[in-house]
Amino acid sequence: MKKYDVIVVGAGIIGLSIAWQLARRSALRIAVLEKASAVGEGSTGASSAICRFRYSIDEVVFLARDGINAYRHWSEFTGLKAPRASFNSDGVLWMPGGDLAWADREHARMQALGIATEVLDDADIRARFPAINPCILAPDFETGEDHECRFGSRNFFEVDGGYIDPVATTEDLAEACRNAGVDVRLKTRVASVDTRGGAVRGVTLDDGVTIETPLMINAAGPWCRRLYEEAGVELKWDLVPTRIQVIYRDRPAELEGHIPVSVDMQGGVYFRTQNRGQQLVIGSVLEEDEKEAVANPDEFRKEADDDFQMLKLHAMHHRLPALPYRGQVRGYCGLYTVNRDDVHPVLGPTAVDGFWVANGFSGHGFKLAPAIGSMVARAITGDATDFDTAVPMSFLSIDREPIRLDSKSVLA
């Protein structure tokens, strides 16, 4: 019978980050079990992988900072001489529209936390990002009809933000894990969890094979609730698989100049480039677009809805006036595991000895993943190393009270 010191269930960005952070600081025998045929085929593969610092809670700002630091030094962090992924330092532009005090307030707060930020006015936007319209009014969502814009904007810019390819990143982590002796097993589904005597003893796979372990980490994303049930763990948090829509289109030649990762709070969209700037990826920042619960994460509509596409295109046409309505627009859908209680993840040990969790990331998981991995690995091993975060795991403990927030959206 195969034995491991730790089993991580789920080979997305969270599971592999935990496994890698364990492997790089210990000699533990580690296995990652993934039911899909490739790593990152769940929430991670559909992620826009935007790496931004600004959050309303300071501890999450620090987690984002520490996660992004790993992405910005990816070869050093993974130990790979030629990693597939590399960080795109496009910066992150926040456009709050008519709330003219917001940018200065957030700039002061981020500066106090050690994050490099700037406040940009209309002239700055036009000079640095000529394709972007700094209008402070909301677009016409119904028809997309142009209006007479009002200017005088105050915008907030994260100098060191950007994005990284989510699939390449996950493949790199899997390679780093294997190089360190981690057994990354694909097409391997956990059928049941042995918790005799109130402690994890091992797991049984779909093919009937039994694996012994005293410690199992549930990093199964939208499939996490089934493992709670298998382990007999009562979950007080409302973790809901939620359909999230994204659209993309080719970038036309009319859009000149640099386009940063952008958060248009009036328009309810975020956007960034991809494929060396040749495409635009567009998603929602609205809480109302994070409400579609999915009963079965293996069965949900994976194409974006027509009305969603049109609403977001109206917003994009307003923010990027040179963007024509012509051209093919494509869409896809992925899943967040939304923690409806406070849109923050829950981590750590449960009432069943040896059953640990890392679930409910609510769309924040990618940028936080290296830091989350370090939190969990340090809590298990007691050892610290480079690229660790100083934020204690207790901040996101499964036993904590919900974090109080003004808005339960992906912006948090």
Regions found by a protein language model. Give the residues of each.
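Central helical "cap/lid" subdomain
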Residues: 40, 209-258
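Dinucleotide-binding Rossmann-like beta1-alpha1 core, especially the glycine-rich loop
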Residues: 48-141, 268-270
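Conserved beta-strand-loop-beta-strand element in the redox core of flavoprotein oxidoreductases
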Residues: 191-211, 216
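Active-site lid/adjacent beta-loop-alpha segment flanking the redox-cofactor pocket in flavoenzymes
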Residues: 236, 252-353
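Flavin (FAD/FMN) cofactor-binding core of flavoprotein oxidoreductases
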Residues: 123-133, 241, 303-381, 385-405
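Glycine-rich FAD pyrophosphate-binding loop
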Residues: 23-44
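Flavin (FAD/FMN) cofactor-binding and adjacent substrate-gating region
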Residues: 99-180, 185-186, 192-199
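Beta1/beta-strand and adjacent pyrophosphate-binding region of the FAD-binding site
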Residues: 1-14, 31
